[in-house]
From Swiss-Prot:
Root EC class: oxidoreductase
Signal peptide: none
Name of the protein in its database record: Glycine dehydrogenase (decarboxylating)
Described function: The glycine cleavage system catalyzes the degradation of glycine. The P protein binds the alpha-amino group of glycine through its pyridoxal phosphate cofactor; CO(2) is released and the remaining methylamine moiety is then transferred to the lipoamide cofactor of the H protein.
Organism this protein belongs to: Salmonella typhimurium (strain LT2 / SGSC1412 / ATCC 700720)
SUPFAM superfamilies for the chain: PLP-dependent transferases
Keywords: Oxidoreductase, Pyridoxal phosphate
Domain of life: Bacteria
Molecular function GO labels: glycine binding; glycine dehydrogenase (decarboxylating) activity; pyridoxal phosphate binding
Amino acid sequence: MTQTLSQLENRGAFIERHIGPDAAQQQEMLNAVGAESLNALTGQIVPKDIQLATPPQVGEAATEYAALAELKAIAGRNKRFTSYIGMGYTAVQLPPVILRNMLENPGWYTAYTPYQPEVSQGRLEALLNFQQVTLDLTGLDMASASLLDEATAAAEAMAMAKRVSKLKNANRFFVASDVHPQTLDVVRTRAETFGFDVIVDDAAKALDHQDVFGVLLQQVGTTGEIHDYSALITELKSRKVVVSVAADFMALVLLTAPGKQGADIVFGSAQRFGVPMGYGGPHAAFFAAKDEFKRSMPGRIIGVSKDAAGNTALRMAMQTREQHIRREKANSNICTSQVLLANIASLYAVYHGPVGLKRIANRIHRLTDILAAGLQQKGLKLRHAHYFDTLCVEVADKAAVLARAEAAEINLRSDIHNAVGITLDETTTRENVAQLFNVLLGDSHGLNIETLDKDVALDSRSIQQSMLRDDAILTHPVFNRYHSETEMMRYMHSLERKDLALNQAMIPLGSCTMKLNAAAEMIPITWPEFAELHPFCPPEQAEGYHQMISQLSDWLVKLTGYDAVCMQPNSGAQGEYAGLLAIRHYHESRNEGHRDICLIPASAHGTNPASAHMAGMQVVVVACDKNGNIDLDDLRAKAEQHAANLSCIMVTYPSTHGVYEETIREVCEVVHQFGGQVYLDGANMNAQVGITSPGFIGADVSHLNLHKTFCIPHGGGGPGMGPIGVKAHLAPFVPGHSVVQIEGMLTRQGAVSAAPFGSASILPISWMYIRMMGAEGLKQASQVAILNANYIASRLKDAYPVLYTGRDGRVAHECILDIRPLKEETGISELDIAKRLIDYGFHAPTMSFPVAGTLMVEPTESEGKAELDRFIDAMLAIRAEIDQVKAGVWPLEDNPLVNAPHIQSELVAEWAHPYSREVAVFPAGVADKYWPTVKRLDDVYGDRNLFCSCVPISDYQ
């Protein structure tokens, strides 16, 4: 039969690239699960009353090439002016060796958060290096492996200061008036929900206020002034006030460490260590504190431990501080951080080393000195005598200066009264400085760069002597070894080989949606048109961004059934927080601010109660019935009991138990009946898109994990994006921004992230995904995700009971395998199975969530039948191994499961086990064998002997 031109054009070609099983394989799996078609399977599983009659109208699919061309044209509407705005964001030079071998490498960007350390040693080492950079530059004892951005790190510092403060009755937090405005914005938002009183004043007046538990200072103020706060910090410490200092990574290369001056907490952005501005993100924040406060720190901390053979190995330390364990009592709601960006910054430091970093920092400072000397020579006044890279220049005719700057395609900071701000960076050249002279002085200034250089080289006093660093930094060999590109390339590859990412195998983590991050989706994030924009540039220079964000928002509105979307939250946990704040402010607008009870099912993800606590709410747990569903009687009873104070319910759909609850609409109705709002967690949106929607179900607000459902890669633990969709009545209460208030922003509420659109530069990934899939492709993706999960459940249910199912024994897009009966019968645990899967070449499913003693499997639609079968075969083979233990063939204390994973060196070591070396290391054959580099980690040793900085190189070898 002759094909039409439309068929030959094959505009939906990407759908077949994204979805793993082809039509024939889908039919095989449908036959295996007893369904005629995808639509029939969906009809059996999803409650009839929430099924959409037609998919949301987000357009037809486009080819990869057509979508890239369309987005390139949109990106071309952005104007790339040279930015001197500063305010915590500068242009950078990302070394090409890091760009190509990390940022553009799926071996790095498709990995997951390193909960399974045996398959994560490479990125754990890179993160440990990041912590070492932070420790050296801040002068403190303990550092985390990144937070979301500088402003949220400031909010975390405030919360931590209150936790550790000995002044238990103090409720005031002092912020120096020259912190970045976006930092103050986010701090105020967080303080409101905690009930803290924020005082903003000149730092010198910090001692004038009583009942202050913490103080926030900025070492280099937002307009450039270097502050020597040593005396102030000493006095504050004598009053038992917790002192936090915001600092700049590049400035710290030359400036004295705040920790040496007595600061308790030091934080800031690592953006200028090689990470593009990206119109606001993603960027990693660094965070450090004194050792005595380590158990109160927020975020991931990488620690050095031992494996079962006694070898040095790395792991995430002190996880009992975190939301997935402590829930509403956690130090923070942080789940996703910024691992990929922290690793870029880490490797930037490795590549340049201390000598290279000092050269870069000194060059930036020298150019700033030259600029300052020339301007002063011509009669212009500088507001500050002490500076690193930023000048605050008083100008008589500010409008004329800004007009000349615009004509020269230059952005200066313009929000300072009767002055302009100018921040230089590592991309600044002497030609740029000459151009700045022209802008500020006119063309006839007659200044000579070489002459000015000689003058300032002989007599630079712009950094006060007391603030010059006098100690060595980055002395560890890792920062002094890999300075040629060949060495750096090999070092990065050696780290990558230690890890297991999607470029090697399926990562079947339940509740994580480890789907394909297609190359075509990733390409635009490094386009200069997207990568090089400052988040506070004039809006007319970011028209391409605004068009792309507007289109993406419109698509997400249609896909969610909501009325508006806010793009600011830069992680799922931040989205939860922002959504709950919208609910809180909505109630306050109706004079019902007393509503503070948040109902949360017992099965909820740990971020839910942690976010509710952070939003100033009290958590009341709702029971689940024996089938894993929300117990409607318990829900109704608690909603009625707390009717006067009911704020909301946080519910996940499909549930965290992996089923579509039949009564979800009734859940919404009960909560609404008693005056509450419905927060539907978007973690499992991959089983909704095109089939149903939160708005159609009856929810009021949801966050969307763009790093799950909409293809932003997990990056080994970040970046993420968590925009929120809201019904119209909540739209006025989503986050706003104090710096960028452009037309079309929905609100004037406080910010939850440093930048107005969060991590804007990764939004093109989700734009590309939706554009290439189209309405039908998105629905098919959800349906195949459901098919793949049911295929696994169907084939494994006789070996491992499936804990929860819905109608007709079906699951949603994930399934929970119950290991508890096997453990009781044989002594083999879910942990043993998880570690044995490594020997078979797989990352483990999610362990003991949402039910202890289980494994939750989510295959996603991107995995083909061959990979699903490989996983199923591995799980069945492991079940056979468990039977060998049960039969007494292998003793419980010495078998392939409890000794897993096995490493290469065991092949040539003395062998005393009752099973063969071949069974140990080649259970699935020799082809494409993944080799872990460490054996099972000793978690207890790691936390009892906490060590969170770089170890000797010999320990890695």
